[in-house]
Amino acid sequence: MPETKNTLPNTITVGLKNHSMMLVDAEAHQIPELREYFSFFVPNYRYVPAYKNKKWDGKIKLFNQVTRELNVGLYEHLRKFCSDRMYPLRLQETDYGHPAQRNKVDHQTLVKFQESLKLPFPLRDYQYEAVSHGIEKKRAILLSPTGSGKSFICYNLIQWYMDNYGDKQILIVVPTTSLVEQLYKDFDEYGFDVEENVHRIYSGKDKTTDKPIIISTWQSIYKFSREWYENFGCVVGDEVHLFKAKSLSGIMNKCVNAEYRFGMTGTLDGTATNKLVLEGLFGPTKRVTMTRDLQEKGTLAKLDISILLL
């Protein structure tokens, strides 16, 4: 529910411009605070000529102090910013709703829906929790290690989305053509009619389709116009730690009608894109499970390390 409508001193008001950006209305003295809070140093900034020449402070600012725009996925960070400073936060309802909207998940209904999919194997407990979390929050980065079944989580999320929002297309963005084919193959093995429902885009492939799901490399679509992205209601980024920040931001910020956004990755260490940027585009990070836990349960084989001295 939106916070109180009573405007108190230092109240920060936030509303949705679209499903990519929030508009943040704050008092003049709060703007520099917001700009500094939502900023970070670029790796190796000290070696950049603009920094050496004192024309740049080495930071990327995610809050635009001119337009007052901030990525929707940073709403929880904005809440913390206000809470730490005891600034009242007011939610403004727009045609897009408000940034704190959540779904109530009826687990009995969700289980029945998954049974109706006739999946080749049931969801593991952590996979079900990830799907439930994604549905409830509408946007999230799901952090789950290799071998944990991220594509199966993705498949269940998009099946739920198609069942509830059939009028909008789904875009799945991956970093390589091999991952396009791998996801296509995985969905086929899960029992989905991929020939009828999934379109693949990479070099040499047709860029337009009326199929409900598009799987594409980011390199193939990041230069497309905003109009091309307008019919997507759900976007999934697979292996998001491999995406280049400028290209990924360009894609995600043009998906103005994509209320549901899920980033999938096995790690956020050594990412090509800053974690704060990723969370702004997809939402807060949710750790699904860890390699150690999967090894203890027997899902993954335990490591046997031998040292050979040559």
Language-model features and meaning:
Residues P2-Y96:
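N-terminal accessory nucleic-acid engagement/regulatory domains that precede
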Residues K59-F63, R90-Q92, Y96-L143:
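Conserved pre-motif I regulatory segment
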Residues S148-M162, G166-E189, L248, G270:
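Conserved Walker A/P-loop ATP-binding site and its immediately adjacent core
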Residues Y161-K168, G191-E195, E259, K286:
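Post-Walker A helix-loop "phosphate-sensing" segment adjacent to the P-loop in P-loop NTPases
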Residues K168-Q169, D210-I213, F232-C234, A258-F262:
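Loop/turn-to-beta-strand initiation segments
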Residues F187-R226:
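Inter-Walker segment of RecA-like/P-loop motor cores
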Residues I213-I251:
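Conserved RecA-like ASCE ATPase "motif II neighborhood" in helicase/translocase motors
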Residues G233, H241-S306:
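Post-DEXD/H (motif II) to motif III coupling segment of the RecA-like Helicase ATP-binding lobe
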